[in-house]
Design a protein with these regions (language model features):
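Short amphipathic alpha-helix that is part of the acyltransferase structural core
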Residues: 23-78
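Glycine-rich phosphate/pyrophosphate-binding loop shared by adenosine-nucleotide-utilizing enzymes
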Residues: 44, 103-109, 126
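A short helix-loop-beta-strand connector motif used in the catalytic cores of GNAT acetyltransferases and
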Residues: 71, 81-97, 127, 185
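Conserved beta-strand in the GNAT
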Residues: 95-99, 105-114, 132
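Conserved acetyl-CoA binding element of GNAT-fold acetyltransferases
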Residues: 122-135, 184-187
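Conserved acetyl-CoA-binding loop-helix of GNAT-fold acetyltransferases
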Residues: 130-133, 139-152, 176
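Conserved GNAT acetyl-CoA-binding A-motif
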Residues: 147, 154-167
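Conserved beta-strand-loop-alpha-helix junction that forms the acyl-donor binding cleft
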Residues: 163-172, 180, 187-190
Length: 190
């Protein structure tokens, strides 16, 4: 894996690629249209992750969240297809991205995955993960729009709850998104 460069989004004017010209990880119609209406005034667009988004800076945006090594385009695409294929099984991964219409580069990303359970009469729980907004775009409400999209995807899929883990510093933000503190997260890294 190559280390990720922390360069800002490309500022050249590449033509915006419409959803219909992309191989998306799930149907774009599942994302509420009102979110794109809100983003349009800022020349931004929300959609599912596309098979070509490695080249649009997906790893760069994730690097604004945590340390990320770039696996290279081939390995990235293999993971894309693995996750997109999961959307035909009980476990589903919905990865949303926000794209600049000026540059056709990603500026934010987030994931919700659906976990089938034996609890609650074979219910499903949604887990929100990897909310990342490019450092140059933070403070503009993009994280809140991602959380709204991912929560809606979870609810439309029938999840009985949607949960996420966050640092104490981010609790006020997630409370604004309608989430409450429940329990305590434990982790063991290998």
């Amino acid at each position: 894996m190559r280390p990720c460069s922390f360069s800002p989004p490309i500022s050249s004017t590449m033509p915006f690629t419409p959803d219909s010209d992309l191989e998306l990880s799930f149907p774009a119609e599942l994302i509420p249209t009102d979110l794109n209406n809100r983003l349009a005034q800022h020349n931004l667009h929300i959609r599912p992750l596309a098979s070509s988004d490695h080249g649009r800076g997906h790893i760069r945006v994730l690097a604004s969240l945590t340390s990320v090594a770039d696996p290279g385009e081939k390995a990235w695409r293999e993971r894309f297809y693995e996750l997109a294929k999961s959307n035909t099984s009980a476990s589903k991964y919905y990865i949303c991205v926000i794209v600049s219409k000026e540059t056709d580069e990603l500026v934010a990303t987030g994931t919700v995955f659906l976990e089938p359970k034996f609890l609650r009469s074979l219910a499903t729980a949604g887990h929100i993960e990897d909310i990342a907004v490019d450092t140059s775009m933070q403070g503009r409400g993009l994280g809140k729009i991602l959380i709204s999209a991912l929560t809606t995807l979870s609810e439309k899929a029938g999840a009985y709850k949607t949960l996420l883990d966050c640092s104490d510093d981010n609790v006020p933000f997630y409370k604004k998104c309608g989430y409450d503190v429940k329990g305590l997260q434990m982790s063991k890294y290998t």
